[in-house]
Amino acid sequence: MRVAIVSVGDELLTGETVNTNAAWLGRQLRDRGVTVGRVTVIPDDQQEIARVVNEQHAAADAVIVTGGLGPTHDDRTVEGVAAAFGRSVEFHEAAREWIDSISEYAASDLVDGTAVLPTGARQLPNQVGVAPGFVVENCYVLPGVPEEMHQMFEEIAPEFVGEPTNVTVVEIAEPESALLERIEQLRTEFPVSVGSYPGDNV
C-alpha cells in the first residue's frame, strides 16, 4: 500500500509551526508496512488543496490530509477536498449531532460551520476536539491539531495495511565516505534498502 500525505497550513510554510504531523504519520504507517510515497505541504488555499488532492488521489492508494478543518476564514480544506472529487458541500446532520453531544458550544454558529462536509463523506468523530474528520473515496481528512489527529488516525489505522518490514539501526563511528563500498555490497547481495544518515556518532 502506497500513501501520500498532504499537510495544509500557511503556518507550516512560514516555519511558524513544525510539521510534526507528517513525521508522526510516517512512523505509524511504516510500522504497519505501508509506504509513504510523498509528503506535500500546501497553503490554506482552496484551489491548491483541490489540485494537490486530485493529483495524489490518482497516484496513491490512499491520501491522508491534515489541517484546515473548522469554521474560520482560513479553514479551506473541506471545500478544497470536495472540489477535488467534484462534489459540493452540505450540512452533515450526523456530524452536528455528534458535536451537540460533546460540545458546550453546540448552539453557536461557529459549530454550525464545523458540521459542513463534502456530499457523501463518511464522518470521523473527533473524540478530543470539535471539528470532525471525514473520508471521501480514498482520501482521509484529519484535523491539524496533533492530539486530535493522533486519536482520529488510531480509529482508522486498521484500514492501512501493507507488507511487514524490519528496520535495523547500526551506528558506526566512521566517516560516511568510508562506508560507500560496504553499503553498495549490501545492496548488491541482499534485497534490502540501505540509508546512510551522518550524525554526531558518524
Task: Give each language-model segment a name.
Residues 1-44:
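Glycine-rich phosphate/diphosphate-binding loop of Rossmann-like nucleotide-binding domains
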Residues 4-12, 62-68, 139-141:
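Short glycine-rich or small-residue beta-strand-to-loop segments that form or flank ligand, phosphate
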Residues 137-202:
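An accessory alpha-helical subdomain
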